[in-house]
UniProtKB/Swiss-Prot annotation:
The keyword Signal does not apply. It holds the Pfam family LMF1. It comes from Bos taurus (Bovine). Residues 66-120, 215-285, 383-561 are lumenal. This is Lipase maturation factor 1. Residues 1-32 are annotated as: Disordered. Residues 1-42, 145-200, 315-360 are cytoplasmic. The chain crosses the membrane at residues 43-65, 121-144, 201-214, 286-314, 361-382. Disulfide bonds: none annotated. It is found in: Endoplasmic reticulum membrane. GO terms for cellular component: endoplasmic reticulum membrane. It is a multi-pass membrane protein.
Length: 561
């Protein structure tokens, strides 16, 4: 009987127990499953933010490279050299601090005799830096500051061509992006530089102001936003409609009311979700990203909606965005898990002079943004709210808004030329110039170009609301068409006088445009638009008529090519 009792004692003592299991592998939980990222860190968020911002910068510099010479170059429609000279004269004829602060641009420091080359150099440098960040997902403060300075240098000499709200929005977003990164280190996961909470809240504050500003300007603006009828007109009258807008315009009335109510909810209510804890902040980010995707699908609003997605990404932490990154040993996601495990065990990066300096910089950034936000908040609270304005020359904190008023009908300026000797002769054959994207030929399908942007097409939409006296550049364009100017014609899709002598006369005609009805008679004829002439926009002009006009503005007189 002794033997069984001894065996029992051994079992109780654990002598017969198997060897304990090995600890879980790196990046695995206790059951061997892939470990989940913890909430509250932003290592992966920073990578997504930087890549998204770099993508928008890339598009912006690509637009600049393709169009700046024609718009603000040596022979552009509004030469930036003439603009800088006028600023210089205003401040006493020299490059003073006042001139620099009025129009901050590094072009002040370059040789103005080669302005086209200067503009190309700035755009190409921006394209190169943004491409590197987009591909690698890493950046430092030097590279991000370079992108910001380069784009600010273009915006501040771009005049009316760069007068849109998304230019300031990109500069504010880009300024915050500088402080996402370490000073010199080029690493996707710079261990000594965790993502600053100050910067993340700076982005959240930005998206809050963008959305709330857009919502308030609508409620305070056009009556149709209050009676829920604005979407009855928006798709047809927006600056550059796309093919999806053609079909959305014919949606049932109740769907348009639903769209308007949804817009008010997303712009006036959802922004406050940011301040209601992590889960509601994530809900806010998801709703805003989805909203911007819908806007991208339904219209060509340049890179505005793509840019608005960028600060929305700050609503997500590593636990939320982890699914975007592949798992596996040595992968970014695995490295972040290791960092989180080290922090759980109490391991912290040693406190150095660099970390102290960075903390000081982050504190200064928070104070600066808070101080510059005072007039912006007062503007939001004011019944006389102003949208898309800046209260400082560097455009660090700005006001935003979009579509405070909605036009009820679409009008277009159509440029035409004729080779007839007599412009007023009944048998004069007038031929239309076609732009890259704006409506012209009723049979041409609306374009789909977002996030790209044709600046001339967009300004032609505004010009149709005004007279040509308010838009001198359109007469400059007419003069260039009279000379078959190749540079100006590169902004257009079709020159009816290609391979022929230039026209003797150019005129502007004013038309009203309406979408044809899908399945209707005009659509069956291949027409996307129905147009009706309203009258002349500007009278027939010849090169001789414009000689004095060009001379008084110091524009080069167009000579036929």
């Amino acid at each position: 009987m002794a033997a069984p009792r001894e065996s029992l004692r051994r079992r109780k003592a654990g002598a017969g127990d198997p060897e304990p299991e090995a600890p879980p592998g790196q990046g695995r939980d206790l059951k061997g499953r892939p470990a989940r990222l913890r909430a509250g860190t932003f290592w992966l968020t920073r990578i997504v933010l930087l890549r998204a911002l770099a993508f928008v910068y890339f598009v912006a510099f690509l637009v600049a490279f393709h169009q700046n010479k024609q718009l603000i170059g040596d022979r552009g429609l509004l030469p930036c050299r003439a603009y800088l000279q006028s600023v210089q004269r205003h401040f006493g004829g020299r490059v003073s601090w006042d001139a620099l602060s009025y129009a901050p641009t590094i072009l002040w420091l370059l040789d103005w005799s080669h302005m086209d080359a200067n503009l190309d150099a700035l755009a190409l440098l921006g394209l190169g830096i943004s491409s590197f960040i987009l591909v690698s997902g890493c950046a430092n403060m030097v590279l991000m500051a370079a992108l910001w300075v380069l784009y600010m240098s273009l915006v501040n000499v771009g005049q009316i061509w760069y007068s849109f709200g998304w230019e300031s929005q990109l500069l504010e977003t880009g300024f915050l992006g500088i402080f996402l990164c370490p000073l010199w280190t080029l690493s996707a996961l710079p261990r000594g530089t965790p993502t600053s909470w100050v910067v993340m809240w700076g982005f959240r504050w930005l998206i809050f102001r963008i959305m709330l500003g857009a919502g308030l300007i609508k409620i305070r603006g056009d009556r149709c936003w209050r009676d829920l009828t604005c979407m009855d007109f928006h798709y047809e009258t927006q600056p550059v409609p796309n093919p999806v807008a053609y079909f959305l315009h014919r949606s049932p009335w109740w769907f348009h009311r639903f769209e308007t109510l949804s817009n008010h909810f997303l712009e006036l209510v959802v922004p406050f979700f940011i301040f209601l804890g992590r889960r509601m902040c994530i809900v806010h980010g998801a709703l805003q990203v989805l909203f911007q995707v819908v806007l991208i699908i339904s219209g060509n609003l340049s890179f505005l909606n793509w840019l608005t997605i960028v600060p929305s990404l700050a609503c997500f932490d590593d636990a939320t965005l982890g699914g975007l990154f592949p798992s596996g040993p040595g992968r970014l996601k695995d490295q972040v898990l290791k960092i989180q495990e080290e922090e759980t065990r109490g391991a912290r990066a040693p406190r150095t002079r660099g970390s102290v300096a960075r903390g000081t910089v982050n504190l200064a950034l928070g104070i600066l943004v808070a101080w510059l936000s005072i007039p912006v908040v007062l503007n939001l609270l004011s019944p006389r709210q102003v949208m898309n304005s800046s209260f400082n020359p560097l455009r660090i904190v700005n006001t935003y808004g979009a579509f405070g008023s909605i036009t009820r009908e679409r009008t277009e300026v159509i440029l035409q030329g004729t080779a007839s000797a007599n412009a007023s002769a009944p048998d004069s054959a007038w031929e239309d110039y076609e732009f890259k994207c704006k409506p012209g030929d009723p049979r041409r399908r609306p374009c789909l170009i977002s996030p790209y942007h044709h600046r001339l097409d967009w300004l032609m939409w505004f010009a149709a609301f005004q007279t040509y006296e308010h838009n001198e550049w359109i007469i400059h364009l007419a003069g260039k068409l009279l000379a078959n100017d190749a540079q100006a014609l590169s902004l257009l899709a079709r020159n009816p006088f290609e391979g022929r002598d230039p026209p003797r006369w150019v005129r502007g005609e004013h038309y009203r445009y309406k979408f044809s009805r899908p399945g209707g008679r005009h659509a069956a004829e291949g027409k996307w638009w129905i147009r009706r002439r309203l009258g002349p926009y500007f009278p027939p002009l010849s090169r001789q008529d414009l000689r004095g006009y060009f001379t008084s503005r110091q524009w080069p007189y167009p000579e036929p090519e």
